[in-house]
């Protein structure tokens, strides 16, 4: 790491140093390195390409879903979104995501990151409507799709459409293969909460009990079931 930082005038070295500092949660240093790499434009990744290297780093996106990123504008901005989110910088995260939606509008990882951050402000109706529109065509073919559907359901619920949200969560929960347990448990919890919201108390109770059988440590669940 020290050698990379000593050579951080090279965009690829700055990128590697930034990713390593991000994993160490040294956010100020990580941000400096990653912004330097991003500012290099087309020079980012050139040294790796010269020596036929394809470095990747793993980045958490949402609910147990991870992305593999490389030294490109997309990868660097996704890393900066994660960094901004960790620092509570919602405005910074939003700026990077808006750019990502321009350069990679069809990228499901970008969409998942966007909708997750958008749902941090559930009272912004225009933003919620944008989430609903952007996710309208999402199927349930991959774990990333399933994550997107979770946030689509949350947007629908926040707009006062709980039954539509329940339908989305039911579809999202039908495929469990390759889905992180954390994601599946959150889907079940959100659906149970919505059942309770629309007065389907027995169904809500059944969902909460099923969730407890699988994940008794789920935050607040034991209290919800009256077990504590």
Locate predicted features.
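Generic helix N-cap/helix-start motif at coil->alpha-helix transitions
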Residues: 8-14, 25, 29, 69-78, ...
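Acidic, Ser/Thr- and Gly/Pro-rich intrinsically disordered linkers and low-complexity segments
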Residues: 45-68
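Alpha-helical adaptor scaffolds
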Residues: 112-189
């Amino acid at each position: 790491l020290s050698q990379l930082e000593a050579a951080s005038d090279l965009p690829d070295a700055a990128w590697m140093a930034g990713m390593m500092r991000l994993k160490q949660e040294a956010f100020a240093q990580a941000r400096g390195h990653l912004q330097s790499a991003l500012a290099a434009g087309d020079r980012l990744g050139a040294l790796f390409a010269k020596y036929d290297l394809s470095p990747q780093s793993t980045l958490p996106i949402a609910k147990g879903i991870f992305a593999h990123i490389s030294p490109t504008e997309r990868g660097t901005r996704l890393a900066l979104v994660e960094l901004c989110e960790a620092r509570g910088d919602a405005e910074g995260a939003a700026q990077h995501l808006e750019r990502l939606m321009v350069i990679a509008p069809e990228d499901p990882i970008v969409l998942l990151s966007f909708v997750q951050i958008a749902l941090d402000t559930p009272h912004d109706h225009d933003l919620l409507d944008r989430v609903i529109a952007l996710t309208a065509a999402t199927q349930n073919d991959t774990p990333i799709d399933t994550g997107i559907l979770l946030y689509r359901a949350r947007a629908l619920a926040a707009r006062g459409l709980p039954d539509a949200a329940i339908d989305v969560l039911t579809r999202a929960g039908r495929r469990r293969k390759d889905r992180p347990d954390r994601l599946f448990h959150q889907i079940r919890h959100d659906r149970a909460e919505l059942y309770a919201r629309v007065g389907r108390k027995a169904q809500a109770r059944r969902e909460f009990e099923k969730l407890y059988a699988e994940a008794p440590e789920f935050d607040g669940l034991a209290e919800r079931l009256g077990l504590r």
